[in-house]
Amino acid sequence: HSCLVGSEMCIRDRYDIANMGLNSAEYIHIFTEAKKLAYEDRAKYYADMKFTNVPVKELISKEYALERNKLINLKKAGSVYDSGIFENGDTIYLTVADKDGNMVSLIQSNYRGMGSGMVPPNLGFMLQDRGEMFSLDPNHRNSLQGGKRPFHTIIPAFITKDGKPFISFGLMGGAMQPQGHAQIVVNIIDFKLNLQEAGDAPRFRHFGSSEPTGEIMLDGGFLSLESRINDQIRNELLKLGHNLKGVNDEKGVYGGYQAIMLKDGVYYGASESRKDGHASGY
């Protein structure tokens, strides 16, 4: 628990606390928001260090605290915060191309929580656990059965033009993948955005559809819009009968996109701001 004191004290490195005044509204607001951030880390990471790796050094570092404190809105109390950057591994996507016009679109995921936790002896990689995506209804087409491949969400995307490689791209994010891929393609083809703009543009995501695992959609599910989509559009969607619900933008719910395009003999690369990564040439 003592780590929390250090985390909350780091607000002094970003704000002029002394000039705010003892127990002023501004001081109490900032302190409370810093507490919310620190306690999200507490909820996720704090446990017996004999049994789990707790990133104490990182959690109490000034650099980490300053980065977290950037999330504080000085004009409004936060209703939802997430824990910090020390996430478990998840889906990765990369694409590469060579001087001859060959492209590779690669996406890899062991599924939930870095897979099954089972490592084949002497092989050094962990087995996936996508068997979770089977339906337990024996009459379902996607029912659990030995030797059968389960439903999965992995999509390494590729677009050809006149039979030749044009765009190699991918968008991580579980069930967001087909929605995100379609939005990216529409952004490029119909809205004429360039490769980077197509990924950086605000996205939307529908939740709650029926699933291959047997779940059934109820009440039409709900629609979530990124915060950059304005209130006028939100109000129009409400009038159309959509259920709107906010979700935490920081968890990758809107996907993570990277791409390479070959146009007129020139390669273009893109890596969006929602995720780690970059585009580079050689």
What is each stretch, according to the model?
Residues 7, 89-94, 103, 122, ...:
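Short glycine-rich loop/turn motifs
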Residues 83-87, 145-151, 248-252:
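Short Gly/Pro-enriched turn/cap motifs at secondary-structure boundaries
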Residues 100, 148, 181, 190-251:
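Extended C-terminal subregions enriched in glycine
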Residues 102-167, 177-178, 183, 187, ...:
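Active-site rim segments in enzyme catalytic domains, especially the processed small/beta chain
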Residues 1-6, 11:
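Single conserved hydrophobic/aromatic residue that forms the stacking wall/gate
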Residues 73-82, 135-144, 240-244:
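Short Pro/Gly-enriched beta-strand edge/turn motifs at strand-loop
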Residues 15-110, 122-123, 130:
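Internal maturation/activation junctions in enzymes
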